[in-house]
C-alpha cells in the first residue's frame, strides 16, 4: 500500500488556503478539521461531498475535474437577532472573499487548479439539543485539470 502524503491532498491544501480567510473573519477561529466538526463554537470542517469528479474529458487525454466540499462551522446560536445576523454576515463575507480571490487568480496551491467558487450562500443547517450552538454550511467547489 502506498504511503499517503496527507499534507499534499487537495482537501489539506484547501484547508491551508481557507485558514487566513478564517483568521481575518473570526479572531476566535480554532481549526479546520476534515470530516469532523467539534462541539465547541468556532470550529470548522471540510467534508468532501460525493459527486462525479470528471466534468470534461478532452481528446488530448486531459480531464477537467471537480471536488465539492461542505464547509461547515459551529457558531453561537440563540433567539437573539444580532447573533444570527452575524452568522449570516460571516458567510456573506466569506463568499465575497472566495469570489474575489477567484476573479483575481488567488487560488489554493493545488496542482492545475483552475477555479474555486461557493455553490450557495451559507445557511443554517441544524441546532444542537441545547439550542446554544448551530451548524452552518456552505458548499465550495474547486475545478482542476488532470493531464
Specify the residue positions occupied by each region the protein language model found.
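Charged, often glycine-rich, active-site loop that binds/positions anionic groups
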Residues: 42-52
Amino acid at each position: 500500500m502506498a504511503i499517503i502524503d496527507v499534507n499534499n491532498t487537495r482537501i489539506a491544501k484547501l484547508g491551508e488556503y481557507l485558514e487566513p480567510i478564517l483568521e481575518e473573519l473570526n479572531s476566535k477561529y480554532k481549526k479546520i478539521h476534515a470530516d469532523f466538526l467539534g462541539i465547541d463554537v468556532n470550529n470548522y470542517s471540510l467534508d468532501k461531498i460525493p459527486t462525479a469528479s470528471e466534468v470534461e474529458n478532452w481528446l488530448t487525454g486531459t480531464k477537467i475535474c471537480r471536488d465539492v466540499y461542505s464547509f461547515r462551522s459551529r457558531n453561537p446560536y440563540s433567539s437573539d437577532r444580532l447573533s444570527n445576523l452575524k452568522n449570516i454576515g460571516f458567510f456573506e463575507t466569506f463568499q465575497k472573499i472566495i469570489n474575489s480571490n477567484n476573479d483575481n487568480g488567488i487560488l489554493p496551491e493545488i496542482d492545475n487548479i483552475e477555479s474555486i467558487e461557493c455553490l450557495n450562500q451559507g445557511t443554517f443547517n441544524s441546532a444542537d439539543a441545547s439550542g446554544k450552538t448551530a451548524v452552518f454550511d456552505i458548499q465550495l467547489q474547486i475545478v482542476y485539470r488532470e493531464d
